[in-house]
Structures are given as structure tokens and as C-alpha cells.
């Protein structure tokens, strides 16, 4: 390790450029992972906050909550671990003083069931009581919405009062507006014929009705529009960047080792064992990768702090730690190719 540090200090520019490349690759990887997790969270934040384990939908809905309608006659007897959810896309706008419109996901809940009672977490205000009160995603505050505002839904003349703002109220990358199932029936135009879009539960559910089907939450989330494709795209991009980092560190160390072969031959002729030189090369790779990865992490933290709240980015430290370790391991693995060259150096080359 002494030789590795000595060399890096002596060739600051060369090794600085290598670290710079590692920083850029690592930074891009961390940012991509943060954005992937941020987008994934905006797809599923509400569902995650409900702590649901299963959902019952209409069997013909193609595992889509917005396409599912559960008729009243098909509704099973519900227990304390189940909650009806009515969901439909909608457009909201303030009743006075503004013309801007926001596309949202309207979610109707039964006030006697567990999602409304225990899982709706508010950052301000209170839960909706009655069909003309709504709770908005707290992200809509940045759009100018405030407690006490009156809003309209889908251009109707009916006004709804904003009585609260909820945390983690995102579904399909859209803000949620919570209210009653009665309001959902009005927006959906179903009348009293249909009870809800789905039945969520924090346990596994048993379905006996032939018109309904139960799904795990994992299966349901994977079927959210664009969710799986979006995550797979980011995962492939991160994987390609890891391969690129492996190639970059291998090429740089290979070239540097080739340039140092005459020096290594002299050291071998002086009795320095090949194992010591190999250890120095691997030590260099460790120092370069750890330094570059730490700098990339610092850069990511600074970028996250400077980003506007509208940019979906989430730092998951356990996953970030795993990715950092993988980056370091790949870089060290890339140093094994130059190691083969060192092991083949002939001390007699220094005497020729």
C-alpha cells in the first residue's frame, strides 16, 4: 500500500483523471438510481402508505384499479382489515381566482374503514367529513392550493372545500385527492350500482365471487401503467454504467502498468517480490475506486439538496451502499488484468 500511495502522489494528474472518470460514472449511477426510486415512489407512495398486502378487483379489469368496478351485489362481507377504494382520474381547479388545472387521481374512501381511520397521514388540516370536503396531496401546496380553498372536479359546478393535506399521496405519478365514496360514484357516473374500484386489505383475502379476483400487492404494482418498463430501463442503464466503469478502470490501469514495466523490472531485479507489486496495483485500484465513489456520493447529496421538490428523487441508503460496494468491487476486479502482466515480468529485462 505504501508503494501505491507513493505512486499516486507522484502522478497526481494521471490518477486524478482516473478518479475524475470514476466520479462521473458513479455520480451518474447514483443519480439514475435516485430518480428511478423517486419515480417508483411517486407511482406507489399511496399504496405503500396503506400497508396493503392484497387487493380484490373485478376479474375483467386487467389488474387495473381505474378499470375495475365492483358491483354492490358482488361485494363480500368486509372485516376490519379490508377497505373499499374508489379511484378515477380527474381534473381539479380552484373555484375562484385561478385558471390553472391539475390532473389528479381521485380516491374515495369509506370513513369507517382502516385506510381512512389509520393510514391516511395528514401534514395539516383534518380528514374529510362528508361528501363536499377533500384532502389534497401536500405536493399541491407548491401549485398554490391552501386550506380552506374551494375547488371543482372535472369542470362541474359542485364546489369542494380543502380541509387537509396528506403525506405520501401519490398514485401513478399523480397527486391524490381524497374524499368520500359517494363523491367517487358521482365522478365515475356509476350511481349506486357500484360500490368501489377495489378492496384493499393488510392481509391475504379469500374471494368466493366468480366476478372478483384477488391479487398480491406486488402483482398489482407491477401492472401499474409503465411501472415495470420504467424500472427495467433504469436498471439496464445502471448495469451498463457498471460495465463501463469496469472497462474504464481496467484500461487505465493496464496502460499505466505497461508504462511502468521497465520500473517494475528494476524492482524485481532488486529482489522486490512480484506479490508486493501486485498488492500495490490492487491497492491503487482500491484507493481510486473508494475515493471516486465517495466523491460521487458527496456530489449526489449536494445535487439532491439543490434540486427543486418537483424533481422526483429518493435516496435509499442501503441500496446506495450496495451499489457503492459493487462499484468498488468491479473496479478492483478490473485491476486483475494488469496483475497478470506484473506476474510475468522478467527481472532480467532490467539488465538488457
Segments and roles (model prediction):
Residues 102-112, 117-182:
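Hydrophobic secondary-structure segments that place a key small or acidic residue at a functional site
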Residues 1-29, 352:
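N-terminal Sec/SRP start-transfer signal
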Residues 279-280, 284-352:
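Short helix-loop junctions at transmembrane helix boundaries
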Residues 45-110:
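Membrane-proximal extracellular/periplasmic loop immediately following the first transmembrane helix
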Amino acid at each position: 500500500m505504501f508503494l501505491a500511495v507513493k505512486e499516486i502522489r507522484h502522478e497526481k494528474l494521471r490518477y486524478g483523471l482516473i478518479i475524475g472518470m470514476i466520479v462521473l460514472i458513479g455520480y451518474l449511477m447514483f443519480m439514475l438510481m435516485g430518480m428511478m426510486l423517486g419515480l417508483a415512489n411517486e407511482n406507489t407512495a399511496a399504496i405503500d402508505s396503506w400497508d396493503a398486502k392484497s387487493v380484490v378487483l373485478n376479474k375483467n379489469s386487467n389488474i387495473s384499479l381505474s378499470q375495475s368496478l365492483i358491483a354492490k351485489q358482488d361485494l363480500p362481507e368486509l372485516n376490519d382489515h379490508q377497505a373499499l377504494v374508489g379511484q378515477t382520474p380527474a381534473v381539479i381547479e380552484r373555484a375562484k381566482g385561478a385558471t390553472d388545472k391539475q390532473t389528479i387521481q381521485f380516491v374515495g374512501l369509506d370513513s369507517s374503514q382502516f385506510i381512512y381511520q389509520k393510514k391516511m397521514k395528514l401534514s395539516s388540516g383534518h380528514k374529510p367529513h362528508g361528501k363536499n370536503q377533500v384532502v389534497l396531496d401536500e405536493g399541491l401546496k407548491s401549485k398554490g392550493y391552501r386550506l380552506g380553498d374551494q375547488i371543482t372536479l372535472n369542470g362541474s359546478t359542485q364546489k369542494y372545500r380543502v380541509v387537509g393535506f396528506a403525506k405520501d399521496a401519490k398514485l401513478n405519478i399523480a397527486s391524490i385527492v381524497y374524499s368520500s365514496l359517494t363523491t367517487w360514484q358521482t365522478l365515475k357516473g356509476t350511481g349506486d350500482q357500484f360500490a368501489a374500484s377495489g378492496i384493499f386489505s393488510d392481509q391475504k383475502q379469500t374471494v368466493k365471487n366468480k366476478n372478483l379476483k384477488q391479487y398480491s400487492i406486488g402483482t398489482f404494482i407491477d401492472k401499474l401503467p409503465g411501472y415495470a418498463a420504467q424500472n427495467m430501463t433504469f436498471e439496464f442503464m445502471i448495469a451498463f454504467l457498471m460495465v463501463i466503469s469496469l472497462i474504464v478502470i481496467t484500461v487505465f490501469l493496464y496502460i499505466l502498468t505497461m508504462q511502468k514495466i521497465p520500473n517494475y523490472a528494476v524492482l524485481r531485479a532488486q529482489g522486490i517480490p512480484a506479490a508486493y507489486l501486485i498488492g500495490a496495483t490492487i491497492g491503487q485500484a482500491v484507493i481510486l475506486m473508494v475515493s471516486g465513489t465517495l466523491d460521487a456520493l458527496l456530489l449526489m447529496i449536494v445535487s439532491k439538496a439543490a434540486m427543486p421538490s418537483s424533481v422526483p428523487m429518493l435516496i435509499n441508503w442501503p441500496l446506495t451502499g450496495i451499489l457503492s460496494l459493487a462499484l468498488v468491487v468491479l473496479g478492483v476486479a478490473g485491476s486483475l488484468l494488469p496483475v497478470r502482466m506484473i506476474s510475468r515480468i522478467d527481472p532480467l529485462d532490467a539488465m538488457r
